[in-house]
């Protein structure tokens, strides 16, 4: 009996030793990985953490020094010795976030020169100003690189004014955020990017006219002008295929987008529209749509739809569109319905509609009367089935009300879009009372009936928004 217990004890001890050995072997397996794989793993963490792996073993001591991806974050008053230890001949990706003060200006320049000397391909620079002087300027070497393919610059409203001829011959993707760029500087930058394919301008100031007519390879343009002091901008972009334009208080003018095939328009309204701003936005929105001669894919947000509803109320003529795929982002509220209806009617070739339900930020019906017009009174007779923005929040979570609202919207679409082949509706969680079986059964039964009776494929999906 005692011998059997002793034998079982030895077997358990042996299994324990084998388990420990497997763990050790697993650790050794990581150590024996090729450098390329280890470099790839380290590229997903900040460089200061990657440097700490040098204490793991002799094998890891110099691994980080040859990692082709660097992610440097230096805060106020910090110094860094990475430059002296780094040995990789080429940097594929370099991210620099730095707090600027009187002592760190030379460090910013040194890091930029260091990255460019290693033929960096993807460069991201984020400089935050703690001097409050806004006087920092990139060194001339920053504007001269034959290796850069992707550049992302975020400044704290510094001037980005090159004092030399820009030469980014390999650059394909350029993103500029919170920069002050006058027209002549932008012209200099564009002239130095002969193969540029994508341009993003996020909250950049001083730019009044963006002329991309001499950038034949540029296909994607993304402009975000939510900041009030950005000012108006005229866009000349005859070669782009895709445009995303987001703006707030200052409308933009589209001069030429003759090759455009996909557009995404949105207004971020931080205040209720006054009669003056409503008139200005209405004129601008209709002028933009009239420029979209060849647009096949169009995405619009809630404020654009409300402005189009006002235009419909005023009897303003709408342009006829060639849109085949329309995406709208809004709620099922009364103020957007006339705008959606007119978009559908004036898109005779529409094949697909996608709706994403999002919480409405501002409702036109809550503002003061517009030159004697009372939108709520005018729309109530034709859109009474749809609630106002105040009424809809009383309905949220009521499954029966949600079902009727979704059915009303789908019927509205089917009446106004005669060529429609597919409709996709993404319902946010705010429309439900946590009853998933109800969502799957009652709503899906209703959708199946509408789809069959109208010969249109209808999909209803539940989103997390």
Swiss-Prot record:
Alphabetized PANTHER family for the sequence: OJ000223_09.16 PROTEIN
Stretches assigned to the F-box domain: 27-73
CDD domains documented for this protein: F-box_AtFBL13-like
The name this protein goes by in its record: Putative F-box/LRR-repeat protein At3g28410
Domain of life of the source: Eukaryota
Keywords noted in UniProt: Leucine-rich repeat, Repeat
Placement of LRR repeats on the sequence: 127-155, 178-203, 207-225, 278-302, 332-357, 402-427, 447-465
